[in-house]
Curated annotation (Swiss-Prot):
This is Cadmium, cobalt and zinc/H(+)-K(+) antiporter. One of its GO terms (biological process) is cobalt ion transport. It is a multi-pass membrane protein. Involved in divalent cation and potassium homeostasis in the cell. Catalyzes the active efflux of zinc, cadmium and cobalt, in exchange for potassium and H(+) ions. It holds the Pfam family ZT_dimer. It is found in: Cell membrane. GO terms for molecular function: zinc ion transmembrane transporter activity. Residues 34-43, 100-115, 179-311 are cytoplasmic.
């Protein structure tokens, strides 16, 4: 049940953050145009990607709650990961555009209405601080990729607002017009970094990669070290979505075991694996007589057929 309460809290946090950020983003975009500040516009661009990522995260949560059906036996849990990829890609594109725009401006800094820029960026900082605080106190910023993504966005947004504030102050006091494009580039690099990381982690999950926090050798030792298991092969460990890890393998046991004895062994293994963060476990029990390649990790069928022709 803990899981459900958590999802509800996460959803509420996302909804409140979405409303606050979208509202402020509109103000900041208009402000950026009126004051002619690229730092504000780049921060608004970042806010836009935030607001999209929050919206997608909300849709992902809603979809992930839909039950699995005959057509999608895992349910819609992966949507969250697809959403994270799209979001990451959007961040990368936005940041590259801002860098391009800023380089243009260095050679020819336009006139910026600094007071407006300063006011808007200070409001932005306050909004970001509020949203970050709501996320920290109410959401699961550690384990849930979607909330983590949204939280990282907000944190780098905050840096964006700080950048715009500093740029406005530099222009007001020293007349340094280049401070505006410089602040934009710094924000853009931060955006690029978080976009790259979110995309990389999501693609790893889509490629059925081994979850980050799982040590395969340790898992093999754990299963093979369980009394009654002789060895395992055809092992797969993957993430269905962030925080939901699955494992399947074939385990060789003594052919004299009764079904209830093998159930006991399974229960032990499931218990051990749950402590290591794997909750969805499928183990096929076999005896020595069941002929298989003994590779711990599975080979594709094509290779197996080739091997059989040689025998």
């Amino acid at each position: 049940m803990g899981h459900n309460h958590n999802e509800g809290a996460n959803k509420k946090v996302l909804l409140i953050s979405f409303i606050m950020i979208t509202g402020y983003m509109i103000i900041e975009a208009i402000g950026g145009f009126l004051t002619n500040s690229l730092a504000l516009l780049s921060d608004a661009g970042h806010m836009l990607s935030d607001s999209i990522s929050l919206m997608v995260a909300l849709i992902a949560f809603t979809l992930a709650e839909k039950k699995a059906n005959h057509n999608k036996t895992f349910g819609y849990k992966r949507f969250e990961i697809l959403a994270a990829v799209i979001n990451g890609a959007a961040l990368i594109l936005i940041s590259l555009y801002i860098i391009y725009e800023a380089i243009e401006r260095f050679s020819n800094p336009p006139k910026v209405a600094t007071t407006g820029m300063l006011t808007i960026s200070i409001i932005g900082l306050v909004v970001n601080l509020l949203v970050a605080w709501i996320m920290m106190s109410g959401g699961d910023t550690k384990n849930n990729l979607n909330i983590r993504g949204a939280y990282l966005h907000v944190i780098s947004d905050m840096l964006g607002s700080v950048g715009a504030i500093l740029a406005a102050i530099l222009i007001i006091f020293f007349g340094w017009g280049w401070a505006d494009p410089l602040a934009s580039i710094i924000v853009a690099i931060l955006v690029l970094r978080s976009g790259y990381n979110v995309t990389k982690d999501s693609i790893h999950i889509l490629m059925e990669g081994t979850p980050e926090n799982i040590d395969v050798s340790d898992i093999i030792r754990t299963i093979e070290g369980t009394e009654g298991i002789q060895n395992i092969h055809d092992l797969h460990i993957w993430s269905i979505t962030s925080g939901l890890n699955a494992l399947s393998c074939h385990a060789v046991v003594d052919d004299q075991l009764t079904i209830s004895e093998s159930e006991n062994i399974l229960r032990k293994i499931e218990h051990e694996l749950e402590h290591k963060g794997i909750t969805h476990v499928t183990i096929q029990m076999e005896t020595e007589a069941h002929n298989h390649d003994n590779a711990i990790l599975c080979q594709p069928k094509m290779e197996k057929q080739r091997d059989h022709h040689h025998h």
